[in-house]
Amino acid sequence: RLIQVKFPELIKQVVPILSPAEAAAIYIKEELVKRGEYSPEQVGIWFVAPCPAKGSNIRQAVDVNSTAITGAFSISKIYGELCRVLKEDASFSDWQDHVTTGSSYGMGWGAAGGEAKAAGIDNALIVHGVDEAYEVLEQISMNKMHDVDYVECSACYGGCIGGPLTAVNKFVAEKNLQQRV
């Protein structure tokens, strides 16, 4: 969104790639419709967002004309209650075996540098923080950055896992992510 508003001349340089959340939403929606369980209009997919930027990106994305994601809400709003329900609900264990974990690339996407790592880009500049991202985008806009193949900007320090709507401290989130990836 920052690029759309402040640096529209850079939009053509934004890589048109689906986020793991969007790719998963498309897949899930297609699978449910293909099985004949639901019509496309009956499928609602909600993104559990770590930050306002990710939530607003659903409807204002540069790289997609439409989205399979219905809407978004904050992980911090549901985390405690969700954990309580999952621990107490015996039926959760019945379908827990059917739950799959995403790839390490998809899981790592939300950390600073996760996009570049997933894409296999070595010569990348990883920027996190709104002011820092603005400064780098300004330099790119003025054609002052030539020795970088890819720039990954995150509004939040540490990437999305450091977002203000996350359920745990960003340092704890980073440690947890490193253990899973």
Task: Set out the residue ranges of the language-model regions.
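Iron-sulfur-associated redox domains of electron-transfer enzymes in respiratory
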Residues: 1-181
